Amino acid sequence: LARVGWVPSGGGLPVANLQPGAAGGSEGVRRTVELRVENLFAGRAGFAPAEQVFLTARVSRNSHLYCYLANASGVMRLLPNETNSQSLVAANHAIRIPDWMSPTPGFILQADRPGIESVTCLATDRPILAELPEVFRGEPIRPIPGIRNVADLLQAHDGLADSNTFTQARAEWRVL
């Protein structure tokens, strides 16, 4: 057996110049985020209220992933959360939102009131939650005070010192 991806016994980090907590191992790959609704099939116009919605996110390189739901109740952080507390995800790995393969997914995503709903996922090279305004560090899966829509969400992230280091994707659907 060989250990793959573990820190060598000699101490240092396995990737040169990698800072602790950084998403390394896929340098040189342009980061993209793919986000899609899995159960909105051809011919369907949208979801009925209370119908479950399932999404999949995928990043092209190792990244810290933060996903937010925007609906009639406001904007809330879906990932990371109490069940999936780590923001670091591997490149090209399907992240299910919610994790419908888990017996305890942490939450169920249901269409709310008629209108447009969306999930926005942001991928970064390093953890950023501690750098965001205090309201973002509150309990996940609860409306974030003062953040009314996706524009407010993105504006808060633009305030980071190196705001050009995040990539985003959004998936929208209509609640009928």
Task: Map each language-model feature to its residues.
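Secretory-pathway glycoprotein ectodomains that are cysteine- and/or Ser/Thr/Pro-rich
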Residues: L1-L176
